[in-house]
Amino acid sequence: MSQLKDALHEHTFVCVMEFVPKPSAERFAALEAIMARKQLCGWPLTVAIGDRVGSPLDMSPLDAFSSLDTAVPALLHFSGKDRERQDLLVQLKRMDNAGLDQLLILSGDRLPGHQPGQRPVRYLESVAALQITRQARPDWLLGAALNPFKYHEEEGAAQYFKAEKKLSAGADFLTLQMGYDDRKHQEALHWMRRQRTPKPLIACLMALTHGRAKMLEHVAGAVVSPSMRDILAAELDVSKAFAQTRSIERLALQVIGLKLMGYAGVHLSGIHDLAQFQALEQALHTQQGEIHTLEQWAPAWAASWQMPGLPAVTFNPPGAHWRLGESRVSASRTEQARYHVLSGLHSLLFDRSNWLSRSFGWAVTRPVWRTAQGARLLHQLERSIKRPLLGCDTCGRCRLEDTLYICPESCPKGLANGPCGGTSLNRCEFGDRECVHSVKYRTAKSVQQTAVLTDRLIPCIELPTRHQSSWPTWFDPTLTTTPEPCGSGGAPLRLAREEARTAPPKPSAHHSRPAHTKQPAEIDS
């Protein structure tokens, strides 16, 4: 059992030190000096090696690990940015060869240069990647991400719904997005304790200064309120040294508070050399001698965010106050009507039981559609109908029934299981639209279909199935040309076909079915 797995299993508080690999001997030397300490205040130390934080051309986590002169306990990251299933399987084999068995799986933030409508960029979604990895490596320690720092109901509730899917898909622990709102930290912990099988939570932290706050404005999903920026600016006005000292003291205080709340550990970002590490350790030693309960901690945390002449800090964006459990929103009449119309059409044409559906199924499974020209014509017909109406990209295996008729391809990342962590007040990370998963949440809530958002684990789309009609395989799964169902763990295709052939008809959607650069942290759903 690995050090991190041991610590989580034994309920030992753990410190995960984030390292973003760059081709710099100084950075590697600094990391090795920190990791040589092996502990932070007696807590076991593990390095987390980031993946594609800046660009796909960054040094890979495996190459970075291999570059270390001394082997250290390591948690590698896998980012789904511009990746397919095969890329993940290759990394698993390479990790086997290196003797590594711990992986933090992320969908990833926006790939630099990715512009919707230009070159398609695929993101291997974390839920599907977790399924693939869990089935391929059942004994590995797998983590995923959760961003609880959401202040509108749609994006916040959808985050927790997707987190439930991640647990079902095989996550052993969740690492939170970087954040400073202690009420949101407690909210996430209370949510986890209500799950059927609670898992450990690790909080991502960074010592926050005015300069870093400005940088975080460009990090998807990170929240630094105007109130926080005012206080950080006031600290800098005193002196840079004063601001730096306050940031380290706050970081130490936050670590202590999270430990008292019941977090399994912390994921520390932005500590780049031994001097910073030692300064944090000294601050922790001092404050541990003074603070022993949450009742003692809360006023100390509030005081750490006070400056003369400024009001008390508020961590939430102005006018946005949602907390888990609050129910305020509903789908518009248009959104509800759209769902009911499309659900009705689906029942007529695709439920496989009424005469119209059987006739349509017979028509689209004729041998003529398996010729090159026939397949091309059928693909063009389906695309011409569904793309203007739904944003469809003819992925070859239609998932509309599982997504309340809101096409996953209308998300710039193509995410089907729920939102990434990069939304801001319901706005997509790309900034050009409302997050489609916020619309999906409102719709599900209004039509009593929220179970769909937690129970249906939607596999990724295999590359060979893209840009062909989904209709023939909907009615006759034996017609599929996909080499292996994504997330199958490599089950032979003939078995998958046999299961599909003998499975009962798929229910209507009326019924739920169980089941850039410059980034200090890459935690994203």
Task: Annotate each predicted stretch with a short phrase.
Residues K5-H9, M35-G42, L62-A71, L92-L100, ...:
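Acidic (Asp/Glu)-rich catalytic clusters
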Residues S55, L378-P504:
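Metallocofactor- and cofactor-centric catalytic cores in central/energy metabolism, strongly enriched
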Residues K5-H9, E26, A33, G108, ...:
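Active-site pocket-lining/capping segments in soluble small-molecule metabolic enzymes
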Residues C15-P21, L45-I49, A74-F78, L103-I105, ...:
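Hydrophobic faces of well-ordered beta-strands that scaffold small-molecule active sites
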Residues F13-A30, A74-Q86, G143-A158, A234-E249:
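Active-site mouth loops of central-metabolism enzymes
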Residues M1-T46:
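Conserved N-terminal beta1-alpha1 strand-loop-helix module at the mouth
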Residues Q186-P198, G211-A213, E249-T365, W369-R383, ...:
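Structured C-terminal cap/extension of enzyme domains
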Residues E26-F28, S55-S66, E84-V90, R110-T133, ...:
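Active-site-adjacent beta->alpha loops and helix N-cap segments on the catalytic face
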